[in-house]
Amino acid sequence: DEALRAGWWEGFVRPGPSVEPKVLFIMGNNPLRRLRGGTRTLLEELWPKLGKVITVDFRWSTTALYSDIVLPAAFFYEKEQFHTLTSSEVRFWAYGQKAIDPVGDSRSEWSMVNGLARTIARRASERGLDEYQVPHGVTPERCKAVLGRALTIPDALRPILGTLRHFHEIPDLLTMNGKYSEDDVEQALKDMVERCKDAGIFEGEESLEKIRARGFVKYN
């Protein structure tokens, strides 16, 4: 609340206070269980405002039980991934190797997101929608970082600032024009390792092959 009052989050709070949320999409979290007072405060204050709650999970979590739609996620051994164990005491990423294909209708999160991207593009075309605005771009904080001084952005300009995108481009943006395949995360994991090396998170001699053989990787 203090940060909001002081304006430190100006331009980053989306949606604004005047916009009532309509859809809550939850992936990799269980807010009704993990947040303090979740089953009381959230169910009483937030849930009645929502038209749809969608949860992605491999089990019937507390949040899933209160969701309108539950998308069954693949379990740990049904997809290839890194398990991030992050704390001041544990500085390792564990490598999770796929042992079997997803059971039943379950899918990996990556597969789900690709499917949603294609569906959004298709439904937008069916409804005659072409463009949408991404709320990034000129903000007081960015102006101060680049110019050394903050600029006051008139309220009338705020809706048109940001990046203009097209709905039909969403699938290609997600896969970087087909570089990443929905059915194979090999290239994405390799690039993840390389970007971590570039940022100094992993040591320079690391590679996906070495991490696979070792089963884990230490990060800085």
What are these regions (language model features)?
Residues 1-162, 166-171, 175-179:
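Non-catalytic alpha/beta scaffold blocks inside enzyme catalytic domains
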